[in-house]
Amino acid sequence: MSWRLSETKKAEAKRPAWRLSDAKYRVSKLVATLGRRRLGRVKLGRLKPFVGLITVFALACVFSPARRGEIIFLDFGNLTDILRQVSEKGIIAVGMTFVILAGGIDLSVGSTLAFAATLSSVMLMRGGYGTPETVVTVLAAGLLVGAINAAVITKGRIQSFIVTLAMMSAARGMARLVSGGSGVEIGYGDGGAPQSFASVGAKVGALAPVPALIFLATVAMAWVVLNKTRFGRYVHAVGSNETASRLSGVSVDWVKFGAFSICSLLAALAGIIHCAQLEQGNPNDGVAYELDAIAAVVIGGTPLSGGVGTVIGTLAGTLIIGIINNILGLNNVDANVQLLLKGVIIVGAVLLQRK
């Protein structure tokens, strides 16, 4: 008996000071193992987005119109167009993944894109700035938008839905202020934007578009952050149980600050790509982009309640939406019907997650 007591005392002596509180220690262990338990619970669920992607791809091949006996959908040019078209919304969806995983929502990403695209065009055409200065300034502006969102949410204790809804209006208002209320065309060549800015929306030779490569690089970096860093583990933990995370010593406010800042930063990056591809920035751009981003995240297996999900699933969700939009366009389906189908798909994805 004395031997057991001495061993217990030795174990307590070795235990760090912050573990001396048994309640706090148990909570800390809970947060530390959230990721491992989550893997065991949702390993099968993670496959659903990819099963859906394969299914949608197969259906697209079946329902695609043909030209000269060849399936138009499988044409290399069409597939690269899909990648190019989903890049902007996909980048936004990656940022939205951080926010939703942390238990929040960001409705201002579409307006942030419009603000970033408009600011880019104004700096290039009216300010005479070069590509590096423009890109850095616009990304900093996007980061500031996210910081404001996070500060009001965490310090004011206001729901993210309300705060970002207000920022949705404010960011679009800022876009109108910097542009004078109208779109600004940039163009390239004499008197236009630098050719280096055009490369942001161009292709690498005859292969993949640069926006698609940026999108895939963003997914890769987000995967590393969410799966290989302490911040990523904290994002999952806060979304799973904010109270337990706070009790264990996690700085919940800073985690949310990081998530919302990353989201707005990526929305600004998407705005730069948007401006480079369309050769203009317009305060009215990006309408309903937040819905597409949320749809991609949810279809990718991340519930709106947060805590569980992967950025790879978001990639799959983005491609699913892109393929559906493409095949509907190839079949000349009315745009209003496309919106209706998108809503049905989102509801279906949520129902599948609950089973």
Question: Language-model segments: what does each one mean?
Answer:
Residues 57-62, 75-127, 152-158, 297, ...:
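Single transmembrane alpha-helix segments in multi-pass membrane proteins
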Residues 261, 267, 277-343:
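Transmembrane alpha-helical segments in multi-pass inner-membrane proteins
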Residues 38-44, 102-105, 124-126, 144-188, ...:
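Short loop segments and helix-boundary regions at transmembrane helix junctions
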Residues 129-138, 144-149, 153, 205-281:
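Helix-loop-helix "hairpin" substructures at the membrane interface of multi-pass membrane proteins
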Residues 49-62, 96, 169-173, 214-223, ...:
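Hydrophobic core segments of alpha-helical transmembrane domains in multi-pass membrane transport
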Residues 1-51, 352-355:
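Transmembrane alpha-helical segments of polytopic membrane transport and secretion proteins
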Residues 160-229, 257-258, 278-283:
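Transmembrane helix-bundle core of multi-pass membrane transporters
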Residues 25-93, 128-133:
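Membrane-interfacial amphipathic/re-entrant helices at transmembrane-helix boundaries
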